[in-house]
Regions:
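A short acidic-Thr-Gly-centered motif at the start of a beta-strand
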Residues: 24-33, 129-131
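Short clusters of hydrophobic/aromatic residues that line enzyme substrate/ligand-binding pockets
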Residues: 23, 54-56, 88, 175, ...
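Short coil-to-helix leader/linker segments, especially the first N-terminal amphipathic alpha-helix
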Residues: 7-25, 78-79
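Short, catalytically relevant binding-site loops at active-site mouths
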Residues: 44-45, 90, 104-106
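Adenosine ribonucleotide-centric catalytic and binding domains
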Residues: 29-83
Length: 197
């Protein structure tokens, strides 16, 4: 559709992130059959060398952005795990779909691609997972992600909601929410392998 044409043009005429070959990395690393957990982000990081196709994740070449730092702090408080890498590929390979609602962004302009039609595609993915699978944990951090709750059948899935890990809201209920242990407890109750965070 038009959105696709525009997306291609955007990458030709403007600097965009993530690199073209990483736009669909979340769904490549976590195929449908393997999804156990879905963490929903808004759109990719918009500074150089940050976005790598997985929400909240960055490469180890750059410092962890504030939200990711706070996620790691909560992980340490929750499970005593100290993260040494900013790259969340290991989570993705264990069935954690790290899905941004909008998959691309123009450099240094947050949310600049929010009208490119990506959300129809990612909403469809969320709904397909909800409709066709069961006992998936959906993690909705912050008001934007929580708007996606309507796509999820709560009678057969588990939703974890809290404030967003960004510095602006982290003290409003993200710290202390213990999402990682809650996810693993649910997975174990359903006879699934827990995530090695």
């Amino acid at each position: 559709g038009l959105g696709d044409v525009y997306k291609r043009q955007e990458y030709q005429t403007a600097k965009c992130f993530p690199p073209k070959n990483q736009i669909f990395r979340a769904i490549e690393l976590t195929p449908f059959d393997e999804v156990k957990v879905v963490i929903i982000g808004q759109d990719p990081y918009h500074n150089d060398n940050q976005a790598n196709g997985l929400c909240f994740s960055v490469s180890d070449k750059v410092k962890a952005p504030p939200s990711l730092k706070n996620i790691f702090k909560e992980l340490e408080d929750d499970l005593g795990i100290k993260k040494t890498s900013n790259e969340l590929e290991m989570w993705a390979k264990q069935g954690v779909l790290l899905l941004n609602a909008t998959l691309t962004v123009r450099a240094h302009e947050a949310n600049s691609h929010k009208d490119l039609g990506w959300e129809q595609f990612t909403d469809f993915i969320i709904k397909e997972i909800s409709d066709k699978k069961e006992n998936v944990v959906f993690v909705l951090w912050g008001a934007f992600a929580q708007k996606k709750a309507g796509l999820i059948d709560t009678s057969k899935h588990f939703i974890i909601q809290s404030a967003h890990p960004s510095p602006f809201s982290v003290h409003k209920g993200f710290f202390g929410s213990r999402p990682f242990s809650k996810i693993n407890q649910f997975l174990e109750e359903k006879g699934k392998e827990p995530i090695n965070w």
